[in-house]
Amino acid sequence: MTRRMDRRQYAQVYGPTTGDRVRLGDTALVLEVDRDLTVYGDECVFGGGKVLRDGMGQAAGAPPEEVLDLVITNALVLDQGGVTKADVGIRGGRIAALGKAGNPDAMAGVTPGMTIGPGTECIAGEGLILTAGGVDSHIHFISPQQAYEAIASGVTTMLGGGTGPATGTNATTCTPGARHVALLLQATDALPVNIGLLGKGNAASPEGLAEQVRAGAVGLKLHEDWGTTPAAIDTCLRVADQLDVQVAIHTDTLNESGCAEHSIAAFAGRTIHTFHTEGAGGGHAPDIIRVCGEPNVLPSSTNPTRPFTVNTVDEHLDMLVVCHHLDPSLPEDLAFAESRIRRETIAAEDVLHDLGAISMMSSDSQAMGRVGEVVTRTWQTADKMRRQRGRLPEERGDNDNLRIRRYLAKYTINPAVAHGLSHEVGSVEPGKLADLVLWRPALFGAKPELVLKGGLIAWAQMGDANASIPTPQPVVARPMFGALGRAVGATSVAFVSRASLEGGAVQGYGLAKRLVAVHGCRGLGKKDMRLNDALPRMEVDPETYEVRADGVLLRCEPAARLPLAQRYFLF
């Protein structure tokens, strides 16, 4: 027996299917479902009188190794590879498969390995968008509370450096020295996110740098406040090449030890991740943005300049003074701060993101950036470009799928690839850690509905705990069981260097989190940045600061209004 349903009714019951379109929050961005892996008429739905009952959608007697621990039914999976309607199966804290879940004895087309049994929990994904947990690659570990803000926003992996509110950490993302690396790995062991630490990379001799990597650092950070000279750049990159870790860099704003071309020469074609590539966050003034045209450079932005608005320039001066230990009464300190803030390059940054020439987005947490706004600022930038530049010429169909996938990749798969984590996190693929974020479309980019860590709900929108049901106000983001006790260690990862694992250093720290070595950090290039691999020929006018890509002037107007803003955060 068959029954016909119109699209609206079907979407209300089972979620959108192929060809349906969904608006993201209050943005101008519209996604369209590319394909549906579920089976019409045999959809999995949980609840009273619904499908997932014993002998119906739930199998009896299936081998335990084939039964899912958790199924997310009928979710709209948004990933850098496309937009797919699917059941998502999780087993052992990892994504087992995307496809059709259920009881193969009673249902058609059940994907192998996606059997629902008595050991299976269910999350109803109908009408929800599912993405990978975000990867923030520019964390100043100033306060541990950042982790809670990050996971509440949909970020599940934090990479960076620091030792707390020390003056050095307030300015630089470095965890200097083997002892600090060990202590910070131990201190962050209780935080419900994946962690990776960057050691200090500023030295003209390699011994101190290698020591930090062998203690567990997943990379090294070169920062101008510690002296980013050509000699330090070369030494740091040599150590990174030997030990297979990434190098992140904040270049010399004052051009004291060299200009942009000198740093590019010191890179010598070797892989390097350039932080806040536009330059307001730091870097050769006024033309560090030129590195967007270098094939060995992996460029990222931090969120203080994202997107360019009528308030962006005014906001930056005070932030710079505080973060970089400047004295506003000293003319030279004020000149240093003002040299980094340029309307023209900030405007160009918007356009370069839209072209896919800046590949990643990050926070610069508590050091000019806001750790809980990486996701929001990314989608605000995408919306601004959609409104000001129109549809991308490469788009197909009446949707913004390419632009949406491009911006999603900036805070998921691309930082994971850049830092050697993509075998574990960064996308919704079988075998990867089940760090997943579920969104109501109306709240997409602003407030996640559920955040899963290693397949267990760690954060969620939750109502009054003394209420009779979960939904009474105030409904706010709250920690769940995945963020508590020994579940944190069972569902999260401490990323370390391979050298530290092989040398046995990190095994002695007594960490509850699983130790995972980064790998494949060297030999990467812009070509490896998914949907963000554009390599334009870059020019910056030293007098007017105008930026051109392939001869085209990059210009856009500052936004006076943004989506995903005050209407979402009244309380």
Swiss-Prot record:
Cite the GO molecular-function annotations of the record.
Answer: nickel cation binding; urease activity
Q: What does the entry give for GO biological process?
A: urea catabolic process
* Protein name as annotated: Urease subunit alpha
What residues make up the catalytic site?
324
Post-translational note: Carboxylation allows a single lysine to coordinate two nickel ions.
Q: Indicate which residues the UniProt annotation says bind Ni(2+) 2.
A: 221, 250, 276
InterPro entries tied to this protein: Amidohydro-rel, Metal-dep_hydrolase_composite, Metal_Hydrolase, Urease_alpha_N_dom, Urease_alpha_subunit, Urease_AS, Urease_asu, Urease_asu_c
Annotated residues that bind Ni(2+) 1 are located at: 138, 140, 221, 364
Catalyzed reaction equations: urea + 2 H2O + H(+) = hydrogencarbonate + 2 NH4(+)
Species of origin reads Anaeromyxobacter sp. (strain Fw109-5)
Annotated substrate binding lies at: 223
A Gene Ontology term for the protein's cellular component: cytoplasm
Q: Which SUPFAM superfamilies match?
A: Composite domain of metallo-dependent hydrolases, Metallo-dependent hydrolases
The coding gene here is ureC
Looking up HAMAP family in the UniProt record yields: Urease_alpha
Keywords of this protein's UniProt record, alphabetized? Cytoplasm, Hydrolase, Metal-binding, Nickel
Cofactor, how bound (note): Binds 2 nickel ions per subunit.
Listed EC numbers = 3.5.1.5
Report the top EC class in one word: hydrolase
What Pfam families does the record point to?
A: Amidohydro_1, Urease_alpha
How does it associate, per the subunit comment?
Answer: Heterotrimer of UreA (gamma), UreB (beta) and UreC (alpha) subunits. Three heterotrimers associate to form the active enzyme.
**Modification N6-carboxylysine, positions:** 221
- Enumerate the spans annotated as Urease domain: 133-571
